[in-house]
Amino acid sequence: MPGSETQIWVKRDELTGTEVSGNKIRKLEFSLAEALEQGCDTVITRGGLQSNHCRCTAIVCSRLGLKVHLILRGDKPEKPAGNLLLDYLAGAQITYVHPKDWDGHEDLARELQEDYASGGSKAFFIPIGASDEVGLWGYIAASEELNKDFERLS
């Protein structure tokens, strides 16, 4: 800042260069590694109709050869647009849950896991936004990365 000794540094995760840029990929990296380690062939996750987390999950699963099933809060629109369109283009299977029924979406996720298992698949469940003890490692890694950046740039 002009005339000040204060420095403001910004880590621009959205500029990492792909359609899955941004902070969502940090947590997803660890969640999907866990899914692969467990031998899963399908990933189930949930979010809103325009969820960035769901978009990233669908695209990365497509690249990894994993099936993805999204549970989305909202009614199916006539024409998908935005992230929802990208979900479809990435090959996601989508179940829509009306907002008034959203409280039961965790039960639906468990039912889907059982359905996939009965069909011979193994499904890994990622909570909304990969906000769990596995996804947390993405931000632990980010803080280590920032420390290295500070050391290098100071």
Can you say where each PLM-predicted feature lies in the sequence?
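PLP-dependent amino-acid enzyme catalytic core
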Residues: 1-154
